[in-house]
Amino acid sequence: MEEDDHAGKHDALSALSQWLWSKPLGQHNADLDDDEEVTTGQEELFLPEEQVRARHLFSQKTISREVPAEQSRSGRVYQTARHSLMECSRPTMSIKSQWSFWSSSPKPLPKIPVPSLTSWTHTVNSTPFPQLSTSSGSQSPGKGRLQRLTSTERNGTTLPRTNSGSSTKAMVLHR
């Protein structure tokens, strides 16, 4: 059910976004007082010393249109659709982040800066990864630095443990 709800919201967002983007750029009707602004961009980053490649694709379209007073006290509606895709990879990992945003308001929408690829990759690069070691000097999970994650169902309840021939463990580093 939760997946259906998510899919329904995604479909609705997609339909609204397509509607917002359906008006071609530069097609203005002299009878209408519509304003639109479009921002698109692509950023790429390569850090050879860290073997990191990153890419960010984004687009944003904002439209301000005149509407009947019964639809908006201001007589205008402001709509924005934003899409972003970020990818970062290095030999030992690959991260992909994608999101879409749509808003509609009778008031002017605040200018939201586009996420910066360099700040995103800085976060990825500065995250220390625990090194696995078998030496006697390594810190054991019993000392509180590592904690086992428990498996949970969608509703948040902990799954019962079972004896089986295989197991999966997830560890989190606490600072």
UniProtKB/Swiss-Prot annotation:
Keywords: Host cell junction, Host Golgi apparatus, Phosphoprotein, Transport, Viral movement protein
Compositional bias ranges of the Polar residues kind: 116-141, 148-169
RNA-binding: annotated segments: 50-156
Region called Homodimerization, residue ranges: 30-47
Subcellular localization: Host cell junction, Host plasmodesma; Host Golgi apparatus
Residue segments, region Disordered: 116-175
This protein's domain notes: The N-terminus is involved in homodimerization. The C-terminus binds ssRNA. The C-terminus is phosphorylated.
Subunit: Homodimer.
Remarks, miscellaneous: Poleroviruses are transmitted by aphids directly into phloem tissue. The virus replicates most efficiently in phloem companion cells and then moves through plasmodesmata between companion cells or into sieve elements for long distance transport.
Similarity-based family: Belongs to the polerovirus movement protein family.
Protein name: Movement protein
Source organism phylogeny: Viruses, Riboviria, Orthornavirae, Pisuviricota, Pisoniviricetes
